[in-house]
């Protein structure tokens, strides 16, 4: 069968990263996990964002079915992280991770996390995130993107950085703080 457009551009991006000797590439799946073109890689860590009723025509009609497809990215010996999920999705993710031999940890359960909505003169409306990783403590980091899901996604990224990011002294929290403060996603949830 012919390759899809997504498969071709995914292969092109992998070639580009290899030729550019990229140190780290953050690769997002297209729709799911199990049959996704990105699943040919063995990552340093696998991340699962909030599972919801998206792309049901491809992934399934229940959260459990969708979670089973998403869990297809889990690899033996590769740690995995997930944001908090509905119980039926969490159960499927835990079962799938155990089956393939991937250590799965949940933000807000195995990894301490809190977030809150704030409004300040300096930053306007935003979320603040606290996450206690194994090596780093991220306290009151600003997430200027609207929506609590953005705080969850930030926590997921911070936990991944904490898990696979190298030596602790290589990361200056002030750099992360400044980078997050400048984060923008024009056109998303703008009026």
Residue ranges, per PLM feature:
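ATP-dependent carboxylate-amine ligase catalytic core
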Residues: 1-41, 57-59, 65, 87
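Glycine-rich, N-terminal phosphate-binding loop of Rossmann-like dinucleotide-binding domains
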Residues: 29, 50-51, 84
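Short glycine-dipeptide loop
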Residues: 43, 76-78
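Conserved Switch II/interswitch segment of TRAFAC-class P-loop GTPases
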Residues: 50-58
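Bacterial c-di-GMP phosphodiesterase catalytic domain signature
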Residues: 71
């Amino acid at each position: 069968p012919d390759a899809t457009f997504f498969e071709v551009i995914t292969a092109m991006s992998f070639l580009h990263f290899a030729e550019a000797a990229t140190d780290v590439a953050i690769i997002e799946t297209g729709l799911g996990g199990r049959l996704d073109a990105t699943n040919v890689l063995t990552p340093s860590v696998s991340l699962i964002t909030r599972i919801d009723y998206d792309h049901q025509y491809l992934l399934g009609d229940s959260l459990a079915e969708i979670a089973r497809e998403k869990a297809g990215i889990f690899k033996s010996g590769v740690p995995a992280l997930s944001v908090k999920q509905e119980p039926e999705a969490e159960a499927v993710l835990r079962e799938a991770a155990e089956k393939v031999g991937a250590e799965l940890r949940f933000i807000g359960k195995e990894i301490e996390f809190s977030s809150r909505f704030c409004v300040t003169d300096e930053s306007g409306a935003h979320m603040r995130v606290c996450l206690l990783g194994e090596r780093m403590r991220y306290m009151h980091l600003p997430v200027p993107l609207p929506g609590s899901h953005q705080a969850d996604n930030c926590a997921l990224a911070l936990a991944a950085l904490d898990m696979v990011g190298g030596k602790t002294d290589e990361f200056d929290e002030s750099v992360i703080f400044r980078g997050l403060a400048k984060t923008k996603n024009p056109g998303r949830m703008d009026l």
